[in-house]
A protein has these predicted regions:
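Terminal intrinsically disordered/low-complexity segments used for targeting and assembly
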Residues: 2-85, 131-135, 146, 170, ...
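Short flexible linkers and secondary-structure junctions
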Residues: 19-190, 334-339, 355-359, 368-378
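Membrane-embedded beta-strand positions in outer-membrane beta-barrel channels/transporters
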Residues: 80, 147-151, 195, 300, ...
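Sec/SRP-type N-terminal targeting helices
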Residues: 91-92, 156-184, 234, 238, ...
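Heptad-repeat amphipathic alpha-helical coiled-coil interaction surface used
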Residues: 97-99, 104, 122, 166, ...
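Hydrophobic stripe of amphipathic alpha-helices that form coiled-coil interfaces
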Residues: 100, 107, 114, 176, ...
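Outer-membrane beta-barrel proteins
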Residues: 127-131, 233, 346-350
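Periplasmic alpha-helical coiled-coil/stalk elements that build and connect Gram-negative outer-membrane
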Residues: 162, 178-299, 409, 413, ...
């Protein structure tokens, strides 16, 4: 009997190295060499003035981790660092990662090691000897049975059900780690985008107010001319309409600025009413945000290893693969070994006198008929893997699209800024000439103000175009996955 038990146990130990189900392999990266059909331009168009330099795209193995420092603004760096430290979104992601790690630690201990428990109990019993056919001996009085023992049990993972389940839990740890990296990337990107938008809105409000002032002066002149019979009433009404329309653009701009401040406050982990970061916000202008001249650009084949959201989707695919292994292993036998040793006495003071009971048990369970449950669960796990793979492919395709969109946007933004800058310079030159001619009586005050109004309008358009280049550069960095990725959990 002992030799048979040893044979069974030895066989179980040998089989414990067998793991059924698919072994996970990361999907192949995208095969395309470029992000768009037209390819990446050698350089974008250039314009004179702030933010007008040409951008070149430099092939690189990865994107700088702290990519926001490429904008050369100490105030922006402080805001991003503060958000990465205090954002509630990141606090939640960190807590979820800790939760996943502790769940893995708990499952690993239960799956890899025997469970050992100590037991101490007292049971009040009474024996009826007559029920055993013993009638000549009187029944003993009731007594208390004291038990102190240690029990050990272990499930031999013959076909890898526990190992696959542990693999799935470890993949969940990877998922939460990449989700944290993705959240960091999103928070940093949102701070940069909001900072650019805030700087642009402040500049737009300033220029628009100057436009209102210029149009108001024009209206005063036209009303004086109307009184003198120099212009028609319809011309004055047209000027009043233009002034009202320009004034009407100020409240929405002020609302957008306030909402941007509120968004930044939440990203920084403070209430919208807080003025904690006002010095940094006041230091942000479009001219202090420098456009990166050289932008690191990774290959599409590297994108799948650089983007945290793609790595998170890969971790979920890994988890689905491991769950197929769990469902497959559940179709096979399971062996359990258990034993205990201890003492059982009728007087509690005798419990320490020595060991007098032990047991050793062996169990084998082979599923035979479960109404199709186990096979259905295996098919369900395989379908879940198919869904996870489709989600992974969709994530990769969306990432490629985001990079392609950002590249095309930057190319168009540069061309737009070039045109807007040329228009602004020409309008400013006209205003300068008009001012000189006005000084010698060559043009009227109305004409001078009109050329100044045109210069302000073109400056407003240039401001928007300059902000678009900064915002889309940040979008490209974010699309390329500029974030510190965690090392894959060792297996």
């Amino acid at each position: 009997m002992n030799s048979r038990a040893l044979l069974i146990i030895s066989t179980a130990l040998v089989l414990a190295g067998c793991t059924v189900g698919p072994d996970f392999h990361a999907p192949a990266p995208p095969e395309s060499a470029t992000y768009t059909r037209e390819g990446t331009p050698a350089a974008t168009a250039a314009a004179q003035g702030a933010g007008g330099g040409a951008q070149i795209f430099v092939a690189a193995p990865n994107v700088p981790n702290a990519w926001w420092t490429q904008f050369g603004s100490a105030a922006l760096d402080e805001l991003v660092d503060a958000a990465l430290t205090a954002s509630p979104t990141l606090d939640s992601a960190r807590a979820k990662l800790i939760e996943a790690r502790e769940n893995y630690n708990a499952q690993a201990g239960a799956a890899l090691f025997p469970s050992v428990d100590a037991k101490l109990s007292a049971t009040r019993e009474k024996i009826d000897l007559a029920s055993f056919g013993i009638t000549a001996v009187p029944n003993p009085p009731p007594f208390t049975l004291y038990n102190a023992s240690i029990s050990v049990s272990y499930v031999f993972d013959l076909f890898g059900a526990n190992r696959r389940a542990l693999e799935a839990t470890l993949a969940q740890v990877d998922y939460e780690a990449y989700e944290l990296a993705a959240a960091r990337l999103t928070v940093a990107g949102n701070v940069v985008s909001a900072a650019v938008r805030r700087a642009s809105l402040r500049e737009q409000i300033t220029i628009t107010q100057q436009l209102v002032d210029a149009q108001s002066r024009q209206l005063v002149i036209m009303e004086a001319r109307l009184a003198a019979g120099g212009v028609a009433d319809i011309d004055v009404r047209s000027q009043r309409t233009l002034l009202a329309q320009t004034r009407a653009t100020l409240p929405p701009l002020a609302t957008q600025l306030a909402q941007t401040d509120h968004q930044l406050a939440v990203l920084l982990g403070v209430p919208p009413s807080s003025a904690q970061f006002q010095p940094q916000l006041d230091g942000l202008t479009l001219d202090t945000l420098h456009l990166p001249g050289a932008v690191a650009l990774t290959l599409p084949s590297s994108l799948a290893r650089e983007r945290p959201d793609i790595r998170a989707a890969e971790a979920l695919l890994h988890q689905a693969s491991a769950n197929v292994g769990v469902a497959t292993a559940n179709l096979y036998p399971q062996i359990t070994l258990s034993g205990s040793i201890g003492t059982e006495r009728t007087h509690i003071e005798d419990v320490v006198d020595g060991l007098n009971i032990w047991n050793l048990g062996f169990g084998l369970t082979q599923p035979i008929f479960h109404g199709g449950e186990l096979h259905a669960k295996k098919r369900a796990a395989e379908a879940a893997w198919d869904a996870a793979f489709a989600d992974y492919r969709q994530t990769v395709l969306q990432a490629l699209q985001q990079v392609a969109d950002a590249l095309r946007a930057l190319e168009s933004d540069a061309q737009a800024l070039q045109s807007r800058d040329e228009a602004a310079r020409e309008a400013q030159a006209s205003a300068t000439v008009a001012l000189a001619r006005y000084g010698v009586g060559g043009v009227s005050e109305f004409s001078l103000i009109d050329t100044q109004r045109q210069a302000l309008q073109t400056a407003l358009d240039r401001t928007r175009a300059q902000a678009d280049r900064l915002a889309d550069t940040a979008a490209l960095y974010q699309a390329l996955g500029g974030a510190t990725l965690p090392a894959e959990t060792a297996r």
